[in-house]
Amino acid sequence: IFAAITILASNYSSAFGGDPTKSALSVFIDSLGYIFDTNYIMESGELGRFTTIFFWLQHNELFGPGGMLFGYGLNATNSGSTVSPGYIGAWYHLILDSTALSMMLWEVGIIGVILFIAMIAAILIVMRPKETLSRYDLKREDLQLLSSAPAFYVFAIGCLLSLPYSQILMIIPMLQFLLWLALGALIVIHRSVRLNSGTQ
């Protein structure tokens, strides 16, 4: 792990013009400070990862409690367009869409975030792997199908874990498609197991 951190930190430092006098470990520790600082705002106006959450907590009732509960509408935080920038980002003159969780809190509110996470979590809980069939009673194709379920499971969990870290799940349609495809595949596999085991 230490070797991986050192390599990543040195690559980060060389790619983004970091201070050559700093060690790889100090670059890594500085990046942790950026992640966990609750008041970190870059010169460009982009908020740090934790800062996005704390900023939302302090300013979410811009037009009343409805904004906190249901958000301010899709694209309200868009900072990547000069043609149609999000009006919440323009209102504060800040980049509020640095993480998917921040985007969701501003755009669909706390109710939307809870429903989104609860729906995925419910699928993962219900579809968690259980030993139902004996592998000796299954064909090779069935084993291959069942063997893919843990990969879909881990992929969906990884997508959920990315919400407070990156905006990628909200801005990449293909990743959203893959997330719902993985969840759908888990449901199909689970249903196939129930049918083959005689439980409906």
Q: Which sequence ranges carry the predicted segments?
A:
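Hydrophobic alpha-helical transmembrane segments and immediately flanking/interface helices
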Residues: S31, L181-R191
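Transmembrane helical bundles and short interhelical boundary loops of multi-pass, membrane-embedded
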Residues: S13, L169, S197-Q200
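Alpha-helical transmembrane segments of helical membrane proteins, especially in multi-pass transport
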Residues: G71, N75, I110-I123, F155-A156
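A membrane-periplasm/extracellular boundary helix in multi-pass inner-membrane enzymes
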Residues: I1-Y40, E61-F63
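Long extracytoplasmic/lumenal interhelical loops at the membrane interface
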Residues: Y40-I111, M127-L138
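Loop-to-transmembrane alpha-helix initiation sites
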Residues: Q167-L179
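Membrane-interface junctions at the ends of membrane-embedded or membrane-associated helices
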Residues: L133-R135, I187-Q200
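Loop-to-helix entry and N-terminal half of a specific, functionally important transmembrane alpha helix
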Residues: W106, I117, L124-Y165, A182-A185
